[in-house]
């Protein structure tokens, strides 16, 4: 009996692995102050589900067939999200509430299943489904069929430049601000930005709207819109890194204003992680991981344009911008989980949200290829090969630049994990070194707490206490 029990005992490495994976896949809420919002309500949800199903099944008018199908689909989505709240993992985030991120994961699973379903339809069936969702799509036209691109590029006037600052330029700016908040690296953001412009050049023979004048591509896109967004996002990152996070209970706040501020701050991060994608001793494994990250990022961006070109809907249509918002929501936990997998030796598998995101990206590409065979038959294979080589080359340049910066200026900036954080799995220093690093100096990990405290004492600008910022 004793030997049987002993065989079930987990080793220390297995325990550490499970703890580290759980912190990125099933993050726990610490210091719960209002138990009601975090206590399981399974019986309540079960009762609500049964009662609501009985009510809608026996009281609604089912004389309109199309209305029955539409309401049935919405009900399936709604109750699938309820199951998501009960059964799916939290992911790496807990703010404003883990249930929100469980529903985000549930929506990503639904979208994944929907893409699988599309693969078994023909093009006419997919178009019929789109016309059922929005009859106006019958009259939609491709932007490339009614607009001209890269015309009279030698004519550069102030009026023409100002005319390019439209809603899409605004979207570029804020989109890159959000991307910078997720990636948190100047070098990687600039590399992805420049690589995307190269991607447009290499795929211009398939998508005519990728054609741009040089001043539009270099000055307006890369420098102003993308660069401004990256700068704003990184400024916010640095601000959040400098804060000391201490969250008090609602019960300890006695003023109405303080309670309101604490409630609003519930929608802000519980802590902030300083990330470091590259290290001076980065191995090939980490370089390859960042290269794969950039390829999937570019693929996801390409899917946006191929989907609306093949299935013919405008960029302003809800099918386009709703997908962009949805992809943005699932990208946040995906990047966090992928970074942990790439840099943490104790994390030996990717998180579930990261896995689903990768499958979605490749499934969208497969859907585009299946239903756009006429378009992809014009593909110049040499351009695609050059594109892959350019991404690899820019990844190497990014690595070289970030390593050079770390060697010359890294000593001025001690890395640290999240300020009073509960997620040590993605901090840079570990007792056994970092994944993808051939030799991580153990002396930093032994003094990590002192380095972190000294940095906070020297640079901290504000402190969040009881939900109220104090200078």
From Swiss-Prot:
Q: Where is this region: Disordered?
A: 426-471
Give the family from UniProt.
Answer: Belongs to the phosphatidyl serine synthase family.
Task: Report the source organism.
Answer: Cricetulus griseus (Chinese hamster)
Residues with the Phosphoserine modification: 417, 440, 452
Q: Which GO terms describe its cellular component?
A: endoplasmic reticulum membrane; membrane
One of the record's GO molecular function terms:
L-serine-phosphatidylethanolamine phosphatidyltransferase activity
Q: Output this protein's name.
A: Phosphatidylserine synthase 1
Q: Which residues lie on this side of the membrane: Lumenal?
A: 57-72, 124-160, 208-216, 308-309, 377-380
What does the record say mutating residue 95 to K does?
Resistant to inhibition by exogenous phosphatidylserine
Write out the pathway annotation from the protein's UniProt entry.
Phospholipid metabolism; phosphatidylserine biosynthesis
- List locations, semicolon-separated: Endoplasmic reticulum membrane
Give the lineage: Eukaryota, Metazoa, Chordata, Craniata, Vertebrata
């Amino acid at each position: 009996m004793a030997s049987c029990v002993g065989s079930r005992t987990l080793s220390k490495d297995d325990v550490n692995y499970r703890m580290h994976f759980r912190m990125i896949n099933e993050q726990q809420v610490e210091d719960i102050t209002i138990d009601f919002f975090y206590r399981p309500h399974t019986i309540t949800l079960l009762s609500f589900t049964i009662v609501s199903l009985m009510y809608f099944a026996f009281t609604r008018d089912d004389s309109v067939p199309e209305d029955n199908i539409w309401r049935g689909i919405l009900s399936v989505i709604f109750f699938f999200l309820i199951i998501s709240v009960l059964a799916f993992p939290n992911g790496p985030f807990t703010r404003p509430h883990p249930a929100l991120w469980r529903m985000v994961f549930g929506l990503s699973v639904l979208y994944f299943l929907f893409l699988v379903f599309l693969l078994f339809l023909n093009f006419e069936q997919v178009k019929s489904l789109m016309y059922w969702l929005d009859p106006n799509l019958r009259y939609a036209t491709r932007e490339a069929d009614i607009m001209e691109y890269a015309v009279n590029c030698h004519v550069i006037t102030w009026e023409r430049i100002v005319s390019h600052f439209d809603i899409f330029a605004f979207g570029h700016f804020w989109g890159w601000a959000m991307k910078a908040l997720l990636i948190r690296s100047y070098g990687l953001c600039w590399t992805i930005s420049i690589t995307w412009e190269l991607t447009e050049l290499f795929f211009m023979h398939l998508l005519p709207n990728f054609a741009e004048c040089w001043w539009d591509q270099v000055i307006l896109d890369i420098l102003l819109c993308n660069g401004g967004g990256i700068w704003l996002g990184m400024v916010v990152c640095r601000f959040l890194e400098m804060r000391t996070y201490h969250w008090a209970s609602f019960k300890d706040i006695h003023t109405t204003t303080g309670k309101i501020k604490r409630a609003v701050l519930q929608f802000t991060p519980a802590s902030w992680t300083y990330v470091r994608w590259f290290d001076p001793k980065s191995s090939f494994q980490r370089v390859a991981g960042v290269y794969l990250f950039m390829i999937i990022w570019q693929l996801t961006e390409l899917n946006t344009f191929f989907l609306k070109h093949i299935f013919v809907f405008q960029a302003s249509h809800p099918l386009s911008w709703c997908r962009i918002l949805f992809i943005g929501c699932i990208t946040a936990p995906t990047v966090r989980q992928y970074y942990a997998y790439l840099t943490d030796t104790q994390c030996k598998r990717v998180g579930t949200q990261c896995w689903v995101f990768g499958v979605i990206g490749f499934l969208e590409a497969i859907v585009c290829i299946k239903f756009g065979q006429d378009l992809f038959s014009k593909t110049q294979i040499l351009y695609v090969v050059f594109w892959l080589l350019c991404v690899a080359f820019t990844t190497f340049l990014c690595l070289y630049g970030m390593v050079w910066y770390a060697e010359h200026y890294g000593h001025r900036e001690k890395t640290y994990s999240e300020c009073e954080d509960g997620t040590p799995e993605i901090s840079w220093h570990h007792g056994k070194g970092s994944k993808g690093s051939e030799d991580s100096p153990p002396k930093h990990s032994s003094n990590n707490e002192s380095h972190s405290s000294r940095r906070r004492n020297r640079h901290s600008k504000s402190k969040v206490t009881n939900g109220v910022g104090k200078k």
